[in-house]
Swiss-Prot record:
Keywords: Disulfide bond, Knottin, Secreted, Signal
Domain note: The presence of a 'disulfide through disulfide knot' structurally defines this protein as a knottin.
Record bears the keyword Secreted: yes
Protein name as catalogued: U1-sicaritoxin-Sdo1a
Tissue expr: Expressed by the venom gland.
Segment forming the signal sequence: 1-24
Disulfide bonds: 43-61, 50-64, 60-69
Propeptide: 25-41
Organism: Hexophthalma dolichocephala (Afrotropical spider)
Main subcellular location of this protein, as a coarse class: secreted
Intracellular or extracellular location(s): Secreted
Gene Ontology cellular component terms for the protein in this record: extracellular region
Amino acid sequence: MMKKFTCFLLCATILCAIFCVSVAEKFHKMKSDIERDETPMECVENGGFCPDPEKMGDWCCGRCIRNECRNG
């Protein structure tokens, strides 16, 4: 009886660890998606003004980044 209980506890621990890792990966992905919210945005037109100058800078050359441009 004790062997079965020990085996059950071991299996439950392994399943719990797998579940916790899965949840942690989902939260990490959600966190990185939220942090990625500041990623450069496409300009309306290359070499034109950014759609949101306060957030992305005054001038675009491919992709808008805060106060600088990057060709993309």
